[in-house]
Curated annotation (Swiss-Prot):
The lineage of its organism: Eukaryota, Fungi, Dikarya, Ascomycota, Pezizomycotina. It comes from Emericella nidulans (strain FGSC A4 / ATCC 38163 / CBS 112.46 / NRRL 194 / M139) (Aspergillus nidulans). Beta-glucosidases are one of a number of cellulolytic enzymes involved in the degradation of cellulosic biomass. Catalyzes the last step releasing glucose from the inhibitory cellobiose. This is Probable beta-glucosidase btgE. One of its GO terms (molecular function) is glucan endo-1,3-beta-D-glucosidase activity. GO terms for biological process: cell wall organization; cellulose catabolic process. Belongs to the glycosyl hydrolase 17 family. It is found in: Secreted, Cell wall. The active site is at E392, E488. It comes from the Eukaryota. Keywords: Carbohydrate metabolism, Cell wall, Cellulose degradation, Glycosidase, Hydrolase, Polysaccharide degradation, Secreted, Signal.
Length: 555
C-alpha cells in the first residue's frame, strides 16, 4: 500500500516523496513569522475605485402560511433557512410523530414580496412545501437567491457584470448579506463604480475558499413588477444532509434578473442618503476580484527584532495581501494580539483566516492549551475557515502522532462547544502523513500538509509546482474521502544550495510561478516577508534559509 502511494509522486523524477530531505525545517521557536525590516513592499496601483452607498431599512420577512389541513401519517415542522428566509414545510418521516406544543403559535405575518425561499435541510427525508400566491402592486427590487456547487479550491462568484465602451461611472444595486448574531439577512445596497476605461467589469463579487465540494447560496438582485406570483409548491426528497433547496415563485409576472446597467452614459457618483448610512470602500485593480490560483499567505504580527507589530501596521500589510489577490491569511498562534489585530484587518479587507494553535517544545500541550480558550473567547467564527492545531509537532519531536491526535480532538471539541462549525486539522510534512495517516486521519476534517519543494535536492525551482502537485496526489490516498490543503509552500530567496534546489531571488520567482500555476488554488504561500529575527532561534539551519522566505513581492 505504501509503495503504491510512493510510486505516484515518483513518476516525475523518481523521488517525489523520497527521503528525510522532505522533512520541513521548522523547530522549536520557529512558529513565528515576522516582517523583515529591509523587505521593501511595492505599493499597488488601483485603476478603479468603489463608493458604496448603504441604505439601511427593515429587512423583508418572507414566511409561508402553515397549511390548515392535517394528515395523520405526517408531522409538520418549521425549517429555518440558514441563509435568507424561514419556510414552513410538511415532512413525511418514519419516525414517531412529534408531540404538538400546547401553546398556540403566534399568527404568521402576511407575505408581502415573492422572494425565493431558501432552506438548508439538516436531515434526510421527504419534505412538502405548500403552494402560495402573492399579489404585488408596486415595482420593487428584492433579494433573490442563487445556488451553485463549488469544488474544493478558491472561487469568485456572484456580483453584477456590465460592459462599458468608454470610461464612465455607473450606479447600480447589488445584493449582499449582513450577519446579525446567528441570523444572516440579504439586503440590497447601491454602489457607484468608476470604470477607468472600456471593458467588462464585475461589481461586488464574492471570493471564497471551500476545502471540500460545497453548495453555496448567494443573493442576487431581482426586479419585481406588479402582478400575481405563484409558488406552485412541491415535494422534494433530501438524500444528503445540508442540502439546499430554492423554492421560486413562477407564473404571472416572473421577477426579472439583475437590472441592466448603463453601458456608455455616465451616472451620478453620489446618491442623496443620510450621511450616517453612507460608507466608502476602494476596489482592487482587478474588477473581477481575487485570482482563483492564490488561496492564502502566511502572516504573523512580529517586527524584525521579534517585538509585536502595531495594529496599524498589521492593517496595512494585511491590506497588501488582499491587494495581491489572496483570499486567506494563515496565522500560527494567539500571541501579540494576533486574533484581535489580524482578525480586525481581515474583517476590514474581506479576507478569511486560517487560525493556528502553536505547540512549543519547552511547554508542550499544557502550554498550548490556553490558546483554545483564547480562540473560543474571541469567537469571530464568521472570519474563520480552518483551525490548525499544531504545526509540525511530530516532525519537531515534540510529541508522538498518537499524542498529537488526542490534542487535536481536544481542540476540536472545545471549538465546537463554543459554536464553531468549520474544519479542524494539523500541519505536518508529507513523510509524517505517510507514516502516521492511520493515527491522524480520524481526528482531522481535511489533511493539512506543509509541502516545501526546496528540501528535496532532486528538484529545481522550475519543477517546484510539479513536485508539490504529485505530493498532493499521494496525500489524497492517505485519508480516504478527505481533501488535502497545502498549508505552507514557497522557495527561499537566499541561502545555500540543496542539490538541484538553489535559493535566490530569480529562483524564487521561477518556483513561485510554478507553484501558483500547479497548486495555487489549494496552497498557502510561505511567507509574507523575510524573518530576520529567526537568527535568535534557528539552531539547525543547514542551508541558511530560515530567514529568507519572504515572497509577497513575487505576486
Amino acid at each position: 500500500m505504501r509503495g503504491a502511494i510512493l510510486a505516484t509522486a515518483a513518476a516525475f523524477a523518481g523521488t517525489a516523496v523520497a527521503d528525510m530531505h522532505m522533512r520541513r525545517h521548522a523547530h522549536e521557536g520557529l512558529h513565528h513569522r515576522a516582517l523583515h525590516a529591509s523587505s521593501a513592499v511595492p505599493e499597488e496601483e488601483c485603476g478603479c475605485t468603489t463608493e458604496v452607498i448603504t441604505y439601511w431599512g427593515e429587512p423583508t420577512t418572507i414566511p409561508l402560511s402553515v397549511p390548515t389541513s392535517t394528515v395523520t401519517s405526517e408531522t409538520t415542522e418549521t425549517v429555518h433557512s440558514t441563509s435568507y428566509s424561514t419556510v414552513t414545510v410538511t415532512a413525511t418521516s418514519s419516525a414517531a410523530p412529534v408531540e404538538t406544543p400546547s401553546e398556540t403559535p403566534s399568527p404568521t405575518p402576511e407575505v408581502t414580496l415573492p422572494t425565493a425561499g431558501v432552506t438548508s435541510y439538516s436531515e434526510t427525508g421527504t419534505y412538502t412545501i405548500p403552494a402560495t400566491t402573492i399579489t404585488v402592486t408596486d415595482t420593487t427590487t428584492v433579494c433573490g437567491a442563487t445556488t451553485t456547487e463549488l469544488p474544493s479550491g478558491t472561487h469568485t462568484y456572484g456580483g453584477v457584470t456590465t460592459i462599458v465602451e468608454t470610461a464612465t461611472t455607473i450606479t447600480c444595486p447589488y445584493a449582499t448579506v449582513k450577519p446579525t448574531g446567528s441570523t444572516v439577512t440579504s439586503v440590497i445596497e447601491t454602489t457607484t463604480y468608476v470604470c477607468p476605461s472600456a471593458g467588462t467589469y464585475t461589481i461586488a463579487p464574492t471570493t471564497t475558499f471551500v476545502p471540500t465540494s460545497t453548495v453555496v447560496v448567494y443573493p442576487t438582485p431581482e426586479t419585481v413588477t406588479p402582478g400575481t406570483y405563484t409558488n406552485p409548491g412541491t415535494t422534494i426528497t433530501v438524500t444528503r444532509t445540508e442540502d439546499v433547496y430554492v423554492c421560486p415563485y413562477t407564473n404571472g409576472n416572473v421577477p426579472t434578473s439583475v437590472p441592466a446597467l448603463p453601458t456608455t452614459s455616465a451616472a451620478s457618483t453620489t446618491t442623496a442618503v443620510p450621511s450616517s448610512s453612507t460608507t466608502t470602500s476602494s476596489a482592487t485593480s482587478v474588477p473581477t476580484g481575487a485570482s482563483g490560483n492564490k488561496m492564502g499567505m502566511t502572516f504573523t504580527p512580529y517586527n524584525n527584532d521579534g517585538s509585536c507589530m502595531a495594529k496599524n501596521d498589521v492593517l496595512e500589510q494585511v491590506g497588501l495581501i488582499k491587494g495581491k489577490g489572496f483570499s486567506h491569511v494563515r496565522v500560527y498562534g494567539t500571541d501579540c494580539h494576533t486574533l484581535e489585530y489580524v482578525g480586525a484587518a481581515c474583517s476590514t479587507h474581506g479576507l478569511k483566516m486560517i487560525l493556528g494553535v502553536n505547540v512549543e517544545g519547552s511547554t508542550g500541550f499544557d502550554g498550548a492549551r490556553s490558546q483554545f480558550k483564547d480562540i473560543t473567547n474571541w469567537g469571530q467564527w464568521d472570519l474563520v475557515s480552518l483551525i490548525v492545531v499544531g504545526n509540525e509537532v511530530v516532525t519537531s519531536n515534540i510529541a508522538s502522532a498518537a499524542q498529537l491526535a488526542s490534542f487535536v480532538s481536544e481542540g476540536a471539541s472545545a471549538f465546537s462547544a463554543a459554536g464553531y462549525t468549520g474544519q479542524v486539522t494539523t500541519a505536518e510534512p508529507i513523510d509524517v502523513w505517510l507514516s502516521n495517516g492511520a493515527t491522524l486521519c480520524p481526528v482531522v476534517d481535511i489533511l493539512g500538509a506543509n509541502l516545501h519543494p526546496f528540501f528535496n535536492p532532486e528538484f529545481t525551482a522550475a519543477e517546484a509546482g510539479t513536485l508539490v502537485s504529485n505530493q498532493i496526489k499521494d496525500l489524497k490516498q492517505v485519508c480516504t474521502g478527505k481533501d488535502v490543503i497545502n498549508l505552507e509552500t514557497g522557495w527561499p530567496n537566499a541561502g545555500s544550495a540543496n542539490g538541484k534546489a538553489i535559493p535566490g531571488q530569480s529562483q524564487q520567482t521561477t518556483a513561485i510561478k510554478s507553484l501558483v500555476e500547479k497548486v495555487g488554488d489549494v496552497s498557502v504561500f510561505f511567507s509574507y516577508a523575510d524573518d530576520g529575527w529567526k537568527s535568535k532561534f534557528a539552531t539547525s539551519d543547514k542551508y541558511n534559509v530560515e530567514q529568507h522566505w519572504g515572497c509577497i513581492d513575487q505576486f
